[in-house]
């Protein structure tokens, strides 16, 4: 969630406060527990076994006044009870943890122009945004859930960390209050509830995240998130956060907070889920009006070995000041994605994804930084040789209406600030191959 198993609520309407996510996987090592305050150890005694033994003793009683001696047999029972003492640690029962690492090798190029090192596009996405070897993320998560409260710490380092969070290495950090079983309230910095993909790629259809994920959706939010479970099939989440509709603002940059919300519905057997929500906030820095509006929907469906995830996003921005041609339409952008996962076996799976992003004329001409008409197609073959290890082979194609991709022998220009020669984008399409290596483990 971030995303797909926003699926925090996605699969079971588990409260997003203590879900995850993402997927969330594994959790903390013994070293992390050494500095924790000493907690009282509870002990319970259980009866393991009972053994009964009989001992027979023969006694001779001398007769009186010439009477004969009498033989007396005495039977004595001995009962032995073997007990087992079990120690329990109630504090540790509420602790979950995860550690992970994700590395890759990426290559693309153009016939006659070779492979260019470094970033391959001008939009700054995805996490695998350059050719060669890379380490997207390495990090982990620790979460403690008590009877009425919880605390979550989620950290990430790596070349992709700065794209994921403005608080590197903090991916998430929040406290949770749970007044009852149906309500949870989070305070702090947390993953978004929107979208059909999450930051942890093993929970997605593909190794790379899509253009919709990067260009049309928030990653995280700073503020308050409240989740309400109406029943086991319907829930509602409400957020009040910093920044604009795309989130990610540790320090507020306008005068009014942003309001976010999401309804979550699941089917009778949870094979189908539908999630619809939005964000509404001031459109500029130090602003309290000109509100932007963002809407997101996700549909999930599962049929045995097949899983389908469809996602759509729409953003209406305040009217820009650059529409010199007299076009007064408010900039409107949109994007859609469709993912299909085929689990051939416990070890092999295939993931497919198709996307299209664009907007109205005012968005394409005055707001967009290059995603004026962007389509992507991705296929991922996955193999899990052992538990918690995922190997991915991925092919990805991208097509744009403008030249946003670099070629090694492309045109150059002089940077007026540094007076250095810089490479200019010269291609409208890009094809790449990616090898992904991911390991994650926890409780």
How would you label these PLM feature ranges?
Residues 95, 148-151, 182-185, 232-238, ...:
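Repeated loop/turn-to-beta-strand initiation elements of outer-membrane beta-barrel proteins
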Residues 99-107, 153-157, 187-189, 238-242, ...:
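Transmembrane beta-barrel strands of outer-membrane/channel proteins
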Residues 109-132, 160-172, 177-268, 273-282, ...:
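Surface-exposed coil loops of outer-membrane beta-barrel proteins
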Residues 254-256, 261-375:
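Detector for outer-membrane/organellar transmembrane beta-barrel domains
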Residues 383-385, 390, 425-443:
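Outer-membrane beta-barrel "beta-signal"
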Residues 88-119, 185, 431:
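Transmembrane beta-strand segments of Gram-negative outer membrane beta-barrel proteins
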Residues 99, 135, 140-144, 172-177, ...:
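Residues on the lipid-exposed face of transmembrane beta-strands in outer-membrane beta-barrel proteins
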Residues 131-136, 166-171, 218-222, 255-259, ...:
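Residues that define the transmembrane beta-barrel architecture of outer-membrane proteins
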């Amino acid at each position: 969630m971030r995303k797909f198993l926003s699926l925090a609520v996605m699969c079971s309407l588990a409260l997003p406060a203590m879900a995850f996510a993402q997927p969330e996987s594994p959790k903390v090592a013994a070293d992390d527990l050494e500095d924790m305050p000493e907690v009282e150890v509870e002990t319970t005694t259980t009866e393991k076994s009972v053994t009964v033994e009989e001992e027979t003793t023969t006694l001779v009683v001398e007769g009186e006044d010439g009477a004969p001696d009498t033989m007396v047999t005495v039977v004595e029972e001995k009962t032995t009870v073997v007990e087992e003492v079990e120690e329990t640690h109630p504090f540790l029962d509420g602790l979950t943890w995860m550690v992970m690492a994700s590395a890759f090798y990426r290559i693309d190029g153009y016939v006659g122009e070779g492979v260019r090192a470094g970033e391959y596009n001008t939009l700054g996405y995805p996490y695998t945004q350059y050719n060669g070897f890379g380490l997207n993320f390495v990090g982990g998560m620790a979460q403690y859930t008590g009877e009425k409260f919880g605390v979550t710490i989620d950290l990430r380092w790596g070349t992709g960390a700065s794209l994921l969070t403005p608080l590197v290495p903090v991916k998430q950090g929040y406290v949770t209050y749970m007044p009852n079983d149906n309500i949870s309230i989070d305070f702090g910095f947390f993953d978004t509830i929107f979208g059909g993909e999450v930051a942890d790629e093993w929970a997605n259809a593909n190794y790379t995240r899509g253009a919709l994920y990067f260009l049309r959706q928030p990653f995280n939010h700073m503020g308050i998130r409240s989740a309400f479970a109406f029943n086991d099939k319907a829930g509602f989440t409400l957020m009040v956060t910093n920044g604009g509709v795309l989130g990610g603002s540790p320090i507020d940059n306008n005068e009014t907070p942003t309001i976010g919300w999401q309804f979550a519905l699941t089917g009778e057997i949870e094979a189908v889920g539908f999630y619809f929500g939005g964000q509404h906030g001031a459109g500029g820095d130090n602003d309290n009006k000109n509100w932007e509006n963002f809407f997101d929907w996700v549909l999930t469906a599962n049929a045995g070995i097949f899983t389908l995830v469809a996602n759509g996003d729409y953003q209406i921005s305040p009217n820009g000041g650059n529409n010199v041609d007299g076009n007064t339409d408010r900039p409107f952008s949109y994007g859609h994605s469709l993912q299909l996962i085929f689990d051939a076996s416990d070890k092999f799976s295939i993931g497919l994804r198709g996307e299209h992003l664009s907007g109205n004329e005012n968005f394409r001409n005055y707001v967009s930084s290059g995603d004026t008409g962007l389509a992507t197609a991705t296929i991922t073959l996955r193999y899990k040789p052992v538990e918690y290890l995922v190997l991915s082979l991925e092919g990805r194609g991208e097509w744009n209406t403008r030249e946003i991709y670099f070629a090694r022998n492309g045109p150059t220009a002089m940077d007026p600030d540094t007076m250095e020669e810089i490479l200019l984008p010269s291609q409208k399409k890009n094809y790449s191959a990616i090898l992904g290596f991911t390991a994650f483990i926890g409780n």
